[in-house]
Design a protein with these regions (language model features):
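A short alpha->beta transition loop at the rim of the catalytic pocket in nucleotide-sugar-dependent
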Residues: 389, 396, 418
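Conserved donor-binding/catalytic core segment of Leloir-type glycosyltransferases
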Residues: 314-333, 339-342
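Conserved small/polar residues in nucleotide/adenosyl-binding loops
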Residues: 448-450
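Short acidic/histidine- and often glycine-rich active-site loop of Leloir-type glycosyltransferases
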Residues: 426-427, 431-437, 441-442
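Short glycine/serine-rich donor-binding loops of glycosyltransferases
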Residues: 408-411, 430
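Short hydrophobic beta-strand element within catalytic cores of glycosyltransferases
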Residues: 420-423
Length: 450
């Protein structure tokens, strides 16, 4: 049976289109009968709980196997629960400063700041930062939910960044050690350890990650490897397995807003000769890449797909007097343009509502802009949603104002719900998805007033 391995650096619950697409294609491959794996590479002590929720929330086929690199090298099937409450670490004579909004307590001993304890909602310890008498952070302990220390970081006093990291199993044995350059965060030496002995050494994290994939794939002749994230492209390219098909799947525009090739995709584009295929989302993107790099036979077009709601008579859906935006709240998405446009809509229809779903580092700036324009009664921030189709289903229209995309899942989801889309004419997607003036509008970039 052909085995498929999807590479993505990390998985979290509240993620955007790339994660959705990764999980969806994994389920599809599994349902078609392929043995399917998702391989992740980041350290997260809460991964087991996150993965359980991901299967449930994203409806991932249970046959899909999700394997994390650190869990693989830790090599433990079952762990005894050793629950530790952060309260057990507080001495009677300690001074405690609590920050309820961040689930953090600061511990002072004899007047000196000694510890910073982060904890989970069940009061289990998540992380402890230790400080010396000169207030330098000296080390950080990362606790698994089961109560053991899974990772230790020893800090550079001046830069306040790790110099050395050690990773432990549930009985306290070190299975991995890293020496890190604190100036750039890159590992300069990585040791795999078994029974107290170094069994493999690497000069970088990338070498470790490629080795991890090689161990999983195990030179299988019928294996297909797909790199779904740009920070896994070089991992896949450097895998020493001639029998595997190596494929890169782009989920975004390969061009920067200034029209130059984005640095994040340079690895894959410059290694077209070393991979079997580059999968893009639109015919226009393929044409642009082939014109610059050639290899037409290797560049394939496979658009995103979505799971639709049960069939309904779109004409009989009762829609509310509102528009909707579902997006990461980052500068690239230009949500501020929509907020400015809402001022114009409000003048014509004071009761019209805009709902904005999503999270991101622009959230507070966008809230401030809403307040500045006195739009608090017309624009509502709703947070992250796992039910985009239902939300689109009750809206008059949706709006997309990105500078660029690889292929906008939000446009596809909106149209699947029978909800028209107003979208900027960015590369790539709107022109190929929207039938202008029939099921939506494609307008010039940055045209706030239509």
């Amino acid at each position: 049976m052909k085995k498929i391995y999807l590479l993505i650096n990390s998985l979290e619950l509240e993620r955007g289109g790339l994660t959705k697409a990764n999980l969806q294609q994994a389920s599809m491959f599994s349902e078609l009968g392929y043995e399917t794996y998702i391989l992740t590479f980041n350290y997260n002590s809460d991964y087991n709980g996150i993965i359980e929720d991901i299967y449930d929330v994203y409806k991932v086929n249970k046959k899909v196997k999700i394997i994390n690199m650190y869990d693989y090298f830790r090599n433990e099937d079952q762990i005894d629960q050793k629950f530790k409450s952060y309260k057990n670490l507080i001495n009677d004579d300690s001074i405690v400063e609590k920050n309820d909004s961040k689930d953090i307590v600061k511990i002072y001993e004899n007047g000196l700041y000694k510890k910073n304890i982060s904890y989970r909602s069940d009061e289990s310890i998540k992380k402890i930062d230790y400080f010396n008498n000169s207030n330098y952070r000296i080390k950080v302990e990362f606790y698994a939910p089961e109560g053991y220390i899974g990772k230790l970081s020893y800090m550079d006093y001046n830069l306040n960044r790790p110099r050395q990291m050690t990773f432990y199993n549930s009985i306290g044995n070190c299975y991995l050690r890293k020496t890190v350059n604190p100036e750039n965060g890159l590992a300069t030496k990585v040791d795999l350890i078994k029974k107290g002995q170094i069994v493999h050494s690497f000069r970088s994290d990338r070498q470790l990650k490629s080795y991890f994939v090689e161990q999983i794939v195990n030179n299988n002749k019928d294996s297909v490897i797909i790199s779904d994230a740009r920070n896994t492209d070089d991992i896949m390219i450097n895998i020493k397995n001639e029998n595997s098909s190596k494929n890169v799947r782009l989920h975004s525009n390969h061009l920067s807003p200034n029209g130059e090739i984005a640095k994040t995709v340079m690895t894959s584009l410059e290694n077209l000769k070393n991979i079997d295929s580059l999968i893009v989302l639109t015919s226009q993107q393929k044409e642009d890449i082939v014109n610059n790099y050639g290899y037409s036979e290797k560049v394939k077009v496979i658009p995103h797909g979505i799971q639709t709601l049960p069939s309904k008579d779109i004409n009989n859906i009762i829609r509310k007097n509102k528009a909707v935006v579902i997006s990461r709240l980052v500068k690239l998405k230009q949500i501020d343009h929509i907020i400015k446009a809402m001022q114009l809509i409000k003048d014509d229809d004071p009761d019209f509502i805009l709902e904005i779903y999503g999270n991101g580092n622009e959230l507070e700036n966008l809230k401030s802009l809403v307040k500045k324009n006195k739009l608090e009664n017309n624009i509502i921030f709703k947070g992250y949603t796992n039910n985009p189709l239902e939300i689109y289903n009750e809206s008059l229209f949706s709006i997309t104002t990105s500078k660029s995309e690889g292929f906008s899942l939000s446009i596809l989801e909106s149209m699947a719900s029978g909800t028209p889309v107003i979208s900027y004419d960015f590369k790539y997607g709107p022109e190929e998805i929207i039938d202008n003036n029939k099921n939506g509008l494609v307008i010039n970039l940055s045209l706030i007033h239509i």
